[in-house]
């Protein structure tokens, strides 16, 4: 998705029509021969998944040193990812991170994508966060974490892994955006995808991540940088799990019959079907809210829409926090990939809300953890 947004072809060359566009520089580095390489590092403890990238459509895009894999997986075990198998590859990973950091003109921070439920996503990610905090203490660290869904479990020990990784990373991460597989599955069904594949799920997550990072990559009238997310959304360091919502999520069939105004997409962001995590916001209170608009949006419409949301009073704010909405506006409209079920729209909004309602997600996880641990299931 980033490649399409910045006009970068699968072999790393820039599209001829985008030669004057410098927006790619923040997430891609340019080589001496003029091709672009993503500023990314992909790590997995087992080689299978990364092999598919090395042989896939984008095999020429990545530098071989940016795809690091071990010889055996963590077997859905946090301890293997953190203490045994993960320890074996942490040094080459950190060395590559140092090399990439040196290649940046002004490093702002890190975006970490991982899952809570698996052994690598939980164990190795927390080990790496520990090392990042030690070496790059002052740099922002934003996480995008796939949270175990209530009904869709890929491993029976997910509650153990999730609790352990959250405990470890709580003090190292500045802001953590949770994504719940079940909520994404529901979005896929609304888009008319009856049997979603991982590709469909990842594409929805990619749209959300793209909206959050758009202001880091493209010029806009009201841009938000990495440290501003932290400043505006996190009142206390440990309460750093904003609820993410995205609108509009339209299928191509529906898009032909709807012309969504700024007000309508803003209202939709506060509806349950737009949320990335299953929880009831009416039962919680908001501590902070950030609305990131992109596309054909003028500041006047955005301010009117947020004022109307405030006036409704259905979204309760805590007494000790002003009812301010941080607004970001970026003029680049959302891009959709070929074959994607989601329709191309002229404007979209991503809402990041720090609300007490997200505690529902943690309660579900705690209950499962307690249930298993009380029986000493899988404890050795």
Curated annotation (Swiss-Prot):
InterPro entries (UniProt xref): Alpha_tubulin, Tub_FtsZ_C, Tubulin, Tubulin/FtsZ-like_C, Tubulin/FtsZ_2-layer-sand-dom, Tubulin/FtsZ_GTPase_sf, Tubulin_C, Tubulin_CS
Names of required cofactors: Mg(2+)
Binding site for Mg(2+): 46
Enzyme nomenclature, EC number: 3.6.5.-
Alphabetical list of SMART domains matching this protein: Tubulin, Tubulin_C
Keyword Thylakoid in record: no
Subcellular location: Cytoplasm, Cytoskeleton
Family in the record: Belongs to the tubulin family.
Protein name, entry field: Tubulin alpha chain
Annotated gene: TUB1
